[in-house]
């Protein structure tokens, strides 16, 4: 099947920080240092397929670092975050004309961050609309829409510090934190967090009692992790996490569940610096927090030869995309022998399959 690239001019007046497809791949949101968000729709025509502008508007008072879509069951909903320390929730108003700058209405602002909001991620959970935010103040905050059909009411449910050593670092917009939820069904929620200037990434697990516990560390990085992505498992017996790093490498980690004795699990948690306790002060074990994973670095690629800024899995977790300062989007997949390889390298004008 032939493949093609569709190039279009976004019309942004400054650097584009992020682009994001909706669940079906028919819509695209772009955000920029020009403080504007633009929503695009893919229109298929007999002569040519094009991306048409749905609307564009000034969304923040500083550079917008990320814009993402909520799952489609909650309607047409976008969240955006910025250097202005705010996260905003936007909802499409189909009664408003396209390109009227009124098509997308602001429903709520999350303003608890004391520094730039560097990353955001909607939780994969069903029956509740949750959003995690990651700020330069070193705190991950988790919010929930009190009524998913009414996006004007959100509440902060939980928060945790990224540093497991309780180090209070100065608020630095260049701290480089990033987050992603585990998209797979587990006993309790999990997420993976890029540790910024502490170098590396760590899994955090919910203990079932409103606490997030620092857990397994993803080793091997020599500089900051710019982006992180947890793969859908699609019935695999193991899980995969990919990282994009300032040290020019794309890494893929394999997580295999271990069944350790309870005492050994508690010892590991004590070594990490925090053990969840009940109100009586006794250690508790619940859900995913009681499970341990063996972490294995199974692939490391330096093909970008430059800083890597983004990694993302496809919906089945079988293809990984990465992009970096070399101006290329690279696609990675595994062969029958279980080894990961580059399957394509995409530039603005051409697609050149890699040599096998």
Residue ranges and their predicted role:
Residues 1-11, 46-61, 94-119, 147-182, ...:
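Inter-blade linker and blade-boundary elements of WD-repeat/beta-propeller domains
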Residues 15, 24, 53, 63, ...:
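WD40/WD-repeat beta-propeller blade-loop signature
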Residues 19-26, 68-75, 121-128, 178-188, ...:
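Loop/turn segments within WD40 beta-propeller blades
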Residues 37-42, 87-92, 120, 140-145, ...:
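WD40-repeat beta-propellers
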Residues 225-264:
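Loop/turn-rich, solvent-exposed surfaces of beta-rich toroidal or solenoidal domains
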Residues 312-355:
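Blade-level signature of beta-propeller repeat domains, shared across WD40, Kelch, NHL, RCC1
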């Amino acid at each position: 099947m032939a493949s093609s690239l569709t190039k279009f001019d976004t019309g942004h007046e400054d650097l584009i920080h992020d682009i994001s497809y909706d669940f079906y791949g028919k819509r695209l949101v772009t955000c920029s240092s020009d403080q504007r968000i633009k929503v695009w729709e893919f229109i298929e025509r007999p002569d040519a397929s094009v991306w048409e502008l749905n609307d564009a508007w000034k969304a923040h008072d500083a550079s917008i670092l990320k814009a993402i879509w909520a799952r489609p069951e909650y309607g047409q909903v976008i969240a955006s975050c910025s250097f202005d320390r705010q996260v905003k929730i936007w909802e499409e108003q189909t009664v408003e004309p396209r390109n009227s700058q009124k098509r997308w209405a602001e429903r709520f602002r999350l303003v608890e961050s004391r520094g730039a909001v560097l990353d955001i991620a909607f939780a994969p959970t069903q029956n509740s609309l949750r959003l995690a935010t990651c700020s330069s103040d070193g705190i991950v905050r988790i919010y929930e829409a009190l009524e998913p059909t009414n996006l004007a009411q959100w509440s902060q449910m939980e928060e945790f510090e990224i540093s497991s050593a309780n180090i209070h670092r100065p608020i630095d917009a260049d701290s480089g934190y990033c987050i992603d939820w585990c998209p797979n069904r587990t006993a309790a929620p999990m997420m993976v967090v890029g540790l910024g200037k502490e170098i590396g990434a760590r899994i955090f697990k919910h203990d079932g009692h409103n606490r997030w516990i620092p857990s397994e560390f993803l080793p091997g990085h020599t500089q900051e992790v710019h982006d992180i992505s947890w793969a859908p498992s699609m019935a695999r017996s193991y899980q995969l996490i990919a990282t994009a790093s300032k040290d020019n490498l794309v890494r893929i980690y394999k997580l295999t569940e271990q069944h350790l004795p309870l005492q050994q699990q508690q010892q590991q948690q004590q070594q990490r610096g925090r053990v969840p306790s009940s109100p009586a002060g006794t250690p508790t074990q619940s859900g995913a927090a009681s499970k341990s994973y063996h972490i294995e670095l199974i692939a490391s690629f330096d093909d970008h030869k430059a800083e890597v800024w983004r990694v993302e899995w496809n919906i089945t977790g079988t293809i990984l995309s990465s992009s970096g300062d070399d101006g290329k989007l690279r696609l990675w997949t595994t062969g029958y022998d279980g080894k990961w390889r580059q399957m394509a390298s995409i530039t603005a004008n051409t697609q050149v399959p890699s040599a096998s």
